Amino acid sequence: MKCCNGAESAKVDGDPAPVPSESDPGTDSRPMHCVVGGAHAFILRISSFFGLAPLRFESRSNGFTVGISNAMCIYSYILVTVLVICTIFGLVAEINVGVDLSVRMSSRMSQFVSTCDVLVVVITAGAGVYGAPKRMRNMLKFMESIASVDTSIGAHYSLATERKLCAILVAILLFFSVLITDDFCFYALQAKKIDRQWDIVTNYIGFYLLWYVVMILELQFAFTALSVRARFQAVNDALALTARHISVPLEKAKEPTPLNIFAIRVAAESRRCANNVSLLVDSMPGKEHAVIIRNAVSGEPKLIVPPCEAIRRLACLHGALCNVVHRIGNSYGLPLIVILISTLLHLIVTPYFLIMEIMVSSHRIHFLVLQFLWCVTHVLRMFVVVEPCHYTINAGKRTEALVCRLMTSTPSTGMLPSRLELFSRQLMLQSVSYTPLGMCTLDRPLVASVLGAVTTYLVILIQFQRYGE
Protein backbone atom coordinates (compact mmCIF):
# COMPACT_ATOMS: atom_id res chain seq x y z
CA MET A 1 0.00 0.00 0.00
CA LYS A 2 3.01 2.20 0.11
CA CYS A 3 4.97 4.06 -2.45
CA CYS A 4 8.37 3.86 -4.06
CA ASN A 5 11.34 6.20 -3.80
CA GLY A 6 12.51 8.52 -6.49
CA ALA A 7 14.98 6.37 -8.40
CA GLU A 8 14.95 4.65 -11.77
CA SER A 9 13.36 1.22 -11.70
CA ALA A 10 16.01 -0.52 -13.76
CA LYS A 11 19.38 0.20 -15.32
CA VAL A 12 21.01 -1.78 -18.12
CA ASP A 13 19.38 -3.54 -21.05
CA GLY A 14 19.38 -7.27 -20.49
CA ASP A 15 19.89 -7.01 -16.75
CA PRO A 16 17.14 -7.35 -14.20
CA ALA A 17 15.96 -4.31 -12.38
CA PRO A 18 18.19 -3.67 -9.39
CA VAL A 19 16.70 -4.17 -6.00
CA PRO A 20 17.58 -1.56 -3.42
CA SER A 21 18.94 -2.97 -0.23
CA GLU A 22 19.45 -1.51 3.17
CA SER A 23 23.16 -1.93 2.76
CA ASP A 24 23.25 -0.03 -0.52
CA PRO A 25 24.96 3.29 0.22
CA GLY A 26 23.06 4.96 -2.56
CA THR A 27 19.69 4.04 -1.16
CA ASP A 28 19.56 6.63 1.58
CA SER A 29 20.76 9.42 -0.73
CA ARG A 30 17.83 9.04 -3.08
CA PRO A 31 14.98 11.51 -2.70
CA MET A 32 12.29 10.01 -0.51
CA HIS A 33 9.29 10.85 -2.67
CA CYS A 34 6.72 9.11 -4.80
CA VAL A 35 3.53 9.85 -6.67
CA VAL A 36 0.33 8.12 -5.58
CA GLY A 37 -3.26 8.42 -6.71
CA GLY A 38 -6.73 7.01 -6.30
CA ALA A 39 -7.45 4.62 -3.44
CA HIS A 40 -3.76 4.53 -2.55
CA ALA A 41 -3.84 8.24 -1.81
CA PHE A 42 -7.15 7.73 0.00
CA ILE A 43 -5.78 5.21 2.52
CA LEU A 44 -2.63 7.30 3.00
CA ARG A 45 -4.71 10.41 3.71
CA ILE A 46 -6.75 8.56 6.33
CA SER A 47 -3.60 7.09 7.87
CA SER A 48 -2.01 10.55 7.95
CA PHE A 49 -5.01 12.04 9.75
CA PHE A 50 -4.74 9.42 12.50
CA GLY A 51 -0.97 9.77 12.81
CA LEU A 52 -0.05 6.50 11.09
CA ALA A 53 1.47 8.03 7.93
CA PRO A 54 3.36 11.26 8.71
CA LEU A 55 3.56 12.35 5.08
CA ARG A 56 3.16 15.61 3.20
CA PHE A 57 0.92 15.62 0.13
CA GLU A 58 1.57 17.86 -2.88
CA SER A 59 -1.14 17.83 -5.52
CA ARG A 60 -0.12 16.96 -9.10
CA SER A 61 -1.98 16.27 -12.31
CA ASN A 62 -1.67 12.48 -11.88
CA GLY A 63 -2.06 12.25 -8.09
CA PHE A 64 -0.08 13.40 -5.08
CA THR A 65 3.63 13.57 -4.41
CA VAL A 66 4.21 12.22 -0.92
CA GLY A 67 7.25 12.29 1.34
CA ILE A 68 8.13 12.24 5.03
CA SER A 69 7.01 15.42 6.82
CA ASN A 70 8.63 16.52 10.08
CA ALA A 71 5.57 18.59 10.93
CA MET A 72 3.29 15.57 10.50
CA CYS A 73 5.65 13.50 12.67
CA ILE A 74 5.23 16.05 15.46
CA TYR A 75 1.46 16.07 14.89
CA SER A 76 1.36 12.26 15.14
CA TYR A 77 3.32 12.20 18.39
CA ILE A 78 1.22 14.94 19.98
CA LEU A 79 -2.05 13.35 18.84
CA VAL A 80 -1.39 9.88 20.21
CA THR A 81 0.21 11.22 23.42
CA VAL A 82 -2.83 13.37 24.20
CA LEU A 83 -5.23 10.51 23.44
CA VAL A 84 -3.24 8.05 25.55
CA ILE A 85 -3.08 10.45 28.52
CA CYS A 86 -6.83 11.15 28.28
CA THR A 87 -7.57 7.43 28.11
CA ILE A 88 -5.37 6.55 31.10
CA PHE A 89 -6.85 9.35 33.23
CA GLY A 90 -10.35 8.29 32.20
CA LEU A 91 -9.62 4.68 33.13
CA VAL A 92 -8.30 5.67 36.56
CA ALA A 93 -11.32 7.93 37.15
CA GLU A 94 -13.73 5.15 36.22
CA ILE A 95 -12.00 2.68 38.56
CA ASN A 96 -12.09 5.20 41.43
CA VAL A 97 -15.86 5.57 41.06
CA GLY A 98 -16.29 2.01 42.30
CA VAL A 99 -18.32 -0.94 41.11
CA ASP A 100 -21.61 0.47 42.40
CA LEU A 101 -21.64 3.55 40.15
CA SER A 102 -19.64 2.32 37.16
CA VAL A 103 -21.67 1.20 34.15
CA ARG A 104 -18.79 -0.77 32.59
CA MET A 105 -17.15 -2.16 35.74
CA SER A 106 -19.95 -3.62 37.84
CA SER A 107 -17.71 -6.22 39.56
CA ARG A 108 -14.06 -6.73 40.48
CA MET A 109 -13.62 -9.20 37.65
CA SER A 110 -15.18 -6.80 35.12
CA GLN A 111 -12.87 -4.08 36.44
CA PHE A 112 -9.85 -6.25 35.66
CA VAL A 113 -11.21 -7.31 32.26
CA SER A 114 -12.18 -3.76 31.24
CA THR A 115 -8.77 -2.45 32.30
CA CYS A 116 -7.08 -5.04 30.07
CA ASP A 117 -9.47 -4.08 27.27
CA VAL A 118 -8.51 -0.40 27.47
CA LEU A 119 -4.78 -0.95 27.94
CA VAL A 120 -4.35 -3.23 24.92
CA VAL A 121 -5.97 -0.56 22.72
CA VAL A 122 -3.62 2.08 24.19
CA ILE A 123 -0.53 -0.08 23.62
CA THR A 124 -1.55 -1.03 20.07
CA ALA A 125 -2.22 2.56 19.04
CA GLY A 126 1.01 3.75 20.66
CA ALA A 127 3.09 1.09 18.93
CA GLY A 128 1.51 2.00 15.60
CA VAL A 129 1.90 5.78 15.79
CA TYR A 130 5.26 6.10 17.53
CA GLY A 131 6.82 3.73 14.99
CA ALA A 132 5.09 5.30 11.98
CA PRO A 133 7.93 7.63 10.78
CA LYS A 134 10.48 4.81 10.61
CA ARG A 135 7.91 2.53 9.01
CA MET A 136 7.07 5.08 6.32
CA ARG A 137 10.76 5.65 5.53
CA ASN A 138 11.22 1.92 5.05
CA MET A 139 8.14 1.79 2.84
CA LEU A 140 9.40 4.57 0.62
CA LYS A 141 12.63 2.62 0.13
CA PHE A 142 11.48 -0.91 -0.58
CA MET A 143 8.58 0.01 -2.86
CA GLU A 144 11.12 0.60 -5.64
CA SER A 145 11.16 -3.19 -5.89
CA ILE A 146 7.40 -3.12 -6.43
CA ALA A 147 7.90 -0.52 -9.15
CA SER A 148 10.52 -2.70 -10.88
CA VAL A 149 8.03 -5.58 -11.03
CA ASP A 150 5.37 -3.32 -12.51
CA THR A 151 7.80 -2.15 -15.18
CA SER A 152 9.13 -5.57 -16.09
CA ILE A 153 5.92 -7.51 -16.59
CA GLY A 154 3.78 -4.97 -18.41
CA ALA A 155 1.48 -3.97 -15.59
CA HIS A 156 -1.87 -2.43 -16.39
CA TYR A 157 -4.34 -0.35 -14.43
CA SER A 158 -8.02 -1.02 -13.64
CA LEU A 159 -10.18 1.93 -12.65
CA ALA A 160 -13.11 -0.36 -11.79
CA THR A 161 -10.97 -2.31 -9.34
CA GLU A 162 -9.86 0.88 -7.65
CA ARG A 163 -13.43 2.08 -7.24
CA LYS A 164 -14.40 -1.25 -5.68
CA LEU A 165 -11.59 -0.97 -3.15
CA CYS A 166 -12.53 2.60 -2.28
CA ALA A 167 -16.10 1.41 -1.69
CA ILE A 168 -14.89 -1.45 0.54
CA LEU A 169 -12.71 0.89 2.61
CA VAL A 170 -15.56 3.37 3.04
CA ALA A 171 -17.96 0.55 3.99
CA ILE A 172 -15.55 -0.81 6.63
CA LEU A 173 -15.04 2.63 8.15
CA LEU A 174 -18.78 3.36 8.14
CA PHE A 175 -19.60 0.04 9.82
CA PHE A 176 -16.95 0.62 12.47
CA SER A 177 -18.13 4.20 13.03
CA VAL A 178 -21.71 3.02 13.55
CA LEU A 179 -20.52 0.34 15.98
CA ILE A 180 -18.37 2.79 17.95
CA THR A 181 -21.18 5.37 18.08
CA ASP A 182 -23.72 2.78 19.19
CA ASP A 183 -21.41 1.47 21.91
CA PHE A 184 -20.67 4.98 23.14
CA CYS A 185 -24.34 5.99 23.19
CA PHE A 186 -25.39 2.78 24.95
CA TYR A 187 -23.08 3.35 27.91
CA ALA A 188 -23.90 7.07 28.00
CA LEU A 189 -27.62 6.23 28.25
CA GLN A 190 -26.93 3.68 30.97
CA ALA A 191 -24.95 6.29 32.90
CA LYS A 192 -27.73 8.85 32.46
CA LYS A 193 -29.87 6.84 34.89
CA ILE A 194 -27.43 7.76 37.65
CA ASP A 195 -26.59 11.20 36.20
CA ARG A 196 -23.07 10.20 35.05
CA GLN A 197 -23.45 10.54 31.28
CA TRP A 198 -20.88 13.33 31.01
CA ASP A 199 -18.41 11.32 33.07
CA ILE A 200 -18.67 8.55 30.50
CA VAL A 201 -18.06 11.05 27.69
CA THR A 202 -14.92 12.50 29.27
CA ASN A 203 -13.57 9.17 30.54
CA TYR A 204 -13.93 7.21 27.32
CA ILE A 205 -13.64 9.68 24.41
CA GLY A 206 -9.89 9.06 24.11
CA PHE A 207 -10.41 5.29 24.23
CA TYR A 208 -12.88 5.33 21.33
CA LEU A 209 -10.65 7.58 19.22
CA LEU A 210 -7.70 5.24 19.80
CA TRP A 211 -9.87 2.44 18.43
CA TYR A 212 -9.84 4.24 15.07
CA VAL A 213 -6.04 4.33 15.14
CA VAL A 214 -5.95 0.56 15.72
CA MET A 215 -8.37 -0.17 12.88
CA ILE A 216 -6.55 2.07 10.39
CA LEU A 217 -3.23 0.44 11.35
CA GLU A 218 -4.64 -3.01 10.57
CA LEU A 219 -6.11 -1.85 7.26
CA GLN A 220 -2.80 -0.21 6.38
CA PHE A 221 -0.89 -3.46 6.88
CA ALA A 222 -3.51 -5.48 5.00
CA PHE A 223 -3.38 -3.03 2.09
CA THR A 224 0.41 -3.32 1.95
CA ALA A 225 0.45 -7.12 2.14
CA LEU A 226 -2.23 -7.49 -0.53
CA SER A 227 -0.31 -5.22 -2.91
CA VAL A 228 2.77 -7.45 -2.59
CA ARG A 229 0.65 -10.54 -3.07
CA ALA A 230 -0.69 -9.07 -6.31
CA ARG A 231 2.90 -8.76 -7.59
CA PHE A 232 3.62 -12.40 -6.67
CA GLN A 233 0.53 -13.35 -8.68
CA ALA A 234 1.80 -11.33 -11.63
CA VAL A 235 5.23 -13.01 -11.49
CA ASN A 236 3.51 -16.40 -11.43
CA ASP A 237 1.38 -15.42 -14.44
CA ALA A 238 4.55 -14.36 -16.27
CA LEU A 239 6.15 -17.70 -15.36
CA ALA A 240 3.13 -19.57 -16.76
CA LEU A 241 3.30 -17.45 -19.93
CA THR A 242 6.98 -18.35 -20.31
CA ALA A 243 6.10 -22.03 -20.00
CA ARG A 244 3.47 -21.71 -22.74
CA HIS A 245 6.05 -19.97 -24.92
CA ILE A 246 8.29 -23.05 -24.79
CA SER A 247 5.29 -25.33 -25.43
CA VAL A 248 5.00 -26.54 -21.84
CA PRO A 249 1.53 -25.32 -20.80
CA LEU A 250 1.40 -25.54 -17.01
CA GLU A 251 -1.94 -23.80 -16.53
CA LYS A 252 -4.94 -22.87 -18.59
CA ALA A 253 -4.51 -19.42 -20.12
CA LYS A 254 -6.47 -16.76 -18.27
CA GLU A 255 -6.98 -13.04 -18.20
CA PRO A 256 -3.98 -11.20 -16.71
CA THR A 257 -4.62 -9.85 -13.24
CA PRO A 258 -4.45 -6.06 -12.98
CA LEU A 259 -1.46 -5.20 -10.83
CA ASN A 260 -3.49 -2.60 -9.09
CA ILE A 261 -5.93 -5.29 -8.02
CA PHE A 262 -5.71 -3.56 -4.65
CA ALA A 263 -5.60 -0.10 -6.19
CA ILE A 264 -1.87 0.40 -5.97
CA ARG A 265 -1.28 3.26 -8.36
CA VAL A 266 2.36 4.27 -8.03
CA ALA A 267 4.58 6.51 -10.11
CA ALA A 268 8.27 7.19 -9.61
CA GLU A 269 9.57 10.72 -9.23
CA SER A 270 12.77 10.53 -11.27
CA ARG A 271 15.65 12.92 -10.70
CA ARG A 272 16.55 12.79 -14.39
CA CYS A 273 13.07 13.19 -15.86
CA ALA A 274 11.07 16.37 -15.85
CA ASN A 275 7.74 14.55 -15.88
CA ASN A 276 6.53 11.71 -13.70
CA VAL A 277 6.06 8.44 -15.57
CA SER A 278 3.43 6.00 -14.37
CA LEU A 279 4.99 2.67 -13.53
CA LEU A 280 1.73 0.98 -14.43
CA VAL A 281 1.87 2.03 -18.10
CA ASP A 282 2.99 -0.67 -20.54
CA SER A 283 5.02 1.47 -22.91
CA MET A 284 8.05 2.43 -20.86
CA PRO A 285 10.48 4.33 -23.10
CA GLY A 286 14.17 3.61 -23.25
CA LYS A 287 16.25 0.44 -23.18
CA GLU A 288 17.34 0.59 -19.60
CA HIS A 289 14.20 -1.11 -18.29
CA ALA A 290 14.36 -4.89 -17.93
CA VAL A 291 10.99 -5.49 -19.56
CA ILE A 292 9.95 -9.13 -19.82
CA ILE A 293 6.36 -8.84 -21.03
CA ARG A 294 4.53 -6.25 -23.10
CA ASN A 295 0.88 -6.16 -24.04
CA ALA A 296 0.26 -6.61 -27.74
CA VAL A 297 -2.15 -4.42 -29.70
CA SER A 298 -4.82 -7.06 -29.12
CA GLY A 299 -4.27 -6.75 -25.38
CA GLU A 300 -2.67 -10.17 -25.02
CA PRO A 301 0.57 -10.30 -22.98
CA LYS A 302 3.61 -11.17 -25.08
CA LEU A 303 7.05 -12.41 -24.01
CA ILE A 304 9.70 -10.11 -25.56
CA VAL A 305 12.84 -11.91 -24.32
CA PRO A 306 14.02 -15.52 -24.76
CA PRO A 307 12.52 -17.98 -22.23
CA CYS A 308 15.89 -18.59 -20.59
CA GLU A 309 16.38 -14.85 -19.99
CA ALA A 310 12.78 -14.52 -18.83
CA ILE A 311 13.33 -17.20 -16.17
CA ARG A 312 16.46 -15.41 -14.96
CA ARG A 313 14.71 -12.06 -14.70
CA LEU A 314 11.63 -13.55 -13.04
CA ALA A 315 13.88 -15.21 -10.47
CA CYS A 316 15.40 -11.80 -9.71
CA LEU A 317 11.97 -10.21 -9.40
CA HIS A 318 10.77 -13.03 -7.16
CA GLY A 319 13.83 -12.57 -4.94
CA ALA A 320 13.13 -8.84 -4.78
CA LEU A 321 9.55 -9.50 -3.68
CA CYS A 322 10.78 -11.94 -1.00
CA ASN A 323 13.00 -9.16 0.32
CA VAL A 324 9.99 -6.83 0.33
CA VAL A 325 8.02 -9.37 2.37
CA HIS A 326 10.81 -9.59 4.92
CA ARG A 327 11.10 -5.80 5.11
CA ILE A 328 7.37 -5.44 5.66
CA GLY A 329 7.60 -8.04 8.40
CA ASN A 330 10.44 -6.10 10.02
CA SER A 331 8.70 -2.72 9.65
CA TYR A 332 5.40 -3.94 11.12
CA GLY A 333 6.96 -6.47 13.50
CA LEU A 334 6.17 -4.88 16.86
CA PRO A 335 2.74 -3.46 15.84
CA LEU A 336 1.72 -6.86 14.44
CA ILE A 337 2.65 -8.71 17.63
CA VAL A 338 0.78 -6.13 19.71
CA ILE A 339 -2.23 -6.40 17.37
CA LEU A 340 -2.29 -10.18 17.72
CA ILE A 341 -2.09 -9.97 21.52
CA SER A 342 -4.75 -7.24 21.46
CA THR A 343 -7.04 -9.35 19.29
CA LEU A 344 -6.55 -12.37 21.55
CA LEU A 345 -7.45 -10.37 24.65
CA HIS A 346 -10.46 -8.75 23.00
CA LEU A 347 -11.69 -12.15 21.82
CA ILE A 348 -11.57 -13.21 25.48
CA VAL A 349 -13.00 -10.01 27.00
CA THR A 350 -15.94 -9.45 24.65
CA PRO A 351 -17.39 -12.99 24.76
CA TYR A 352 -16.88 -12.91 28.54
CA PHE A 353 -19.18 -9.90 28.88
CA LEU A 354 -21.65 -11.49 26.47
CA ILE A 355 -21.76 -14.77 28.41
CA MET A 356 -22.04 -12.97 31.75
CA GLU A 357 -24.98 -10.96 30.44
CA ILE A 358 -26.73 -14.14 29.33
CA MET A 359 -26.05 -15.82 32.70
CA VAL A 360 -27.55 -13.00 34.78
CA SER A 361 -30.61 -12.90 32.47
CA SER A 362 -31.09 -9.14 32.62
CA HIS A 363 -32.72 -9.20 29.15
CA ARG A 364 -30.76 -6.24 27.79
CA ILE A 365 -31.18 -7.17 24.13
CA HIS A 366 -29.35 -4.07 22.93
CA PHE A 367 -26.29 -4.99 25.01
CA LEU A 368 -26.33 -8.59 23.77
CA VAL A 369 -26.49 -7.49 20.13
CA LEU A 370 -23.75 -4.93 20.73
CA GLN A 371 -21.40 -7.47 22.29
CA PHE A 372 -22.12 -9.96 19.51
CA LEU A 373 -21.21 -7.34 16.89
CA TRP A 374 -17.98 -6.62 18.76
CA CYS A 375 -17.17 -10.36 18.74
CA VAL A 376 -17.71 -10.46 14.97
CA THR A 377 -15.58 -7.32 14.56
CA HIS A 378 -12.66 -8.81 16.49
CA VAL A 379 -12.80 -12.03 14.47
CA LEU A 380 -12.80 -9.97 11.27
CA ARG A 381 -9.86 -7.93 12.60
CA MET A 382 -7.86 -11.11 12.98
CA PHE A 383 -8.71 -12.22 9.46
CA VAL A 384 -7.82 -8.77 8.09
CA VAL A 385 -4.28 -9.29 9.40
CA VAL A 386 -3.90 -13.03 8.69
CA GLU A 387 -5.64 -13.55 5.33
CA PRO A 388 -3.40 -11.27 3.20
CA CYS A 389 -0.38 -13.12 4.59
CA HIS A 390 -2.03 -16.47 3.88
CA TYR A 391 -2.72 -15.47 0.27
CA THR A 392 0.88 -14.30 -0.12
CA ILE A 393 2.21 -17.62 1.20
CA ASN A 394 -0.06 -19.46 -1.25
CA ALA A 395 1.31 -17.35 -4.10
CA GLY A 396 4.83 -18.37 -3.05
CA LYS A 397 3.79 -22.04 -3.03
CA ARG A 398 2.34 -21.62 -6.50
CA THR A 399 5.72 -20.32 -7.70
CA GLU A 400 7.41 -23.42 -6.30
CA ALA A 401 4.89 -25.68 -8.03
CA LEU A 402 5.32 -23.90 -11.38
CA VAL A 403 9.11 -24.11 -11.26
CA CYS A 404 8.98 -27.76 -10.23
CA ARG A 405 6.68 -28.65 -13.13
CA LEU A 406 8.84 -26.68 -15.53
CA MET A 407 11.94 -28.57 -14.38
CA THR A 408 10.28 -31.92 -15.02
CA SER A 409 8.77 -30.93 -18.38
CA THR A 410 11.49 -28.99 -20.20
CA PRO A 411 14.24 -30.62 -22.30
CA SER A 412 17.49 -31.36 -20.48
CA THR A 413 19.64 -29.53 -23.05
CA GLY A 414 20.56 -25.85 -23.26
CA MET A 415 20.69 -23.14 -20.59
CA LEU A 416 17.06 -23.36 -19.49
CA PRO A 417 17.49 -26.35 -17.10
CA SER A 418 20.36 -24.62 -15.29
CA ARG A 419 18.31 -21.41 -14.94
CA LEU A 420 15.42 -23.41 -13.49
CA GLU A 421 17.81 -25.20 -11.13
CA LEU A 422 19.09 -21.87 -9.83
CA PHE A 423 15.53 -20.61 -9.47
CA SER A 424 14.56 -23.71 -7.48
CA ARG A 425 17.54 -23.27 -5.14
CA GLN A 426 16.56 -19.65 -4.61
CA LEU A 427 13.04 -20.75 -3.68
CA MET A 428 14.48 -23.14 -1.10
CA LEU A 429 16.52 -20.38 0.54
CA GLN A 430 14.00 -17.51 0.33
CA SER A 431 10.72 -18.31 2.03
CA VAL A 432 7.57 -16.28 1.46
CA SER A 433 6.13 -15.70 4.92
CA TYR A 434 5.43 -12.97 7.44
CA THR A 435 7.08 -13.73 10.79
CA PRO A 436 6.85 -10.58 12.96
CA LEU A 437 9.79 -10.51 15.38
CA GLY A 438 10.26 -14.22 14.60
CA MET A 439 7.56 -15.07 17.14
CA CYS A 440 4.96 -16.63 14.83
CA THR A 441 3.99 -17.08 11.19
CA LEU A 442 0.92 -15.17 10.03
CA ASP A 443 -1.12 -17.93 8.43
CA ARG A 444 -4.45 -19.67 8.98
CA PRO A 445 -3.10 -22.17 11.55
CA LEU A 446 -2.51 -19.15 13.77
CA VAL A 447 -6.27 -18.46 13.72
CA ALA A 448 -6.95 -21.97 15.03
CA SER A 449 -4.38 -21.46 17.80
CA VAL A 450 -5.94 -18.14 18.84
CA LEU A 451 -9.46 -19.58 18.92
CA GLY A 452 -8.23 -22.49 21.04
CA ALA A 453 -6.57 -20.10 23.49
CA VAL A 454 -9.73 -17.98 23.64
CA THR A 455 -11.84 -21.01 24.54
CA THR A 456 -9.42 -22.06 27.29
CA TYR A 457 -9.23 -18.64 28.95
CA LEU A 458 -12.99 -18.08 28.70
CA VAL A 459 -13.60 -21.28 30.64
CA ILE A 460 -11.11 -20.16 33.31
CA LEU A 461 -12.64 -16.67 33.62
CA ILE A 462 -16.19 -17.99 33.89
CA GLN A 463 -15.14 -20.49 36.56
CA PHE A 464 -13.47 -17.72 38.57
CA GLN A 465 -16.61 -15.59 38.26
CA ARG A 466 -18.87 -18.39 39.48
CA TYR A 467 -16.46 -19.15 42.33
CA GLY A 468 -16.45 -15.48 43.35
CA GLU A 469 -20.24 -15.41 43.45
Language model features: what each stretch is:
Residues 2-394, 428-469:
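Membrane-embedded alpha-helical segments and the immediately adjacent membrane-proximal loops
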Residues 151-154, 244, 399-409:
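Membrane-cytosol interface motif
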Residues 390, 394-397, 401-404, 418, ...:
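A generic structural signal for well-ordered alpha-helical surface patches
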Residues 403-424:
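Juxtamembrane non-transmembrane "cap" segments at the membrane-aqueous interface
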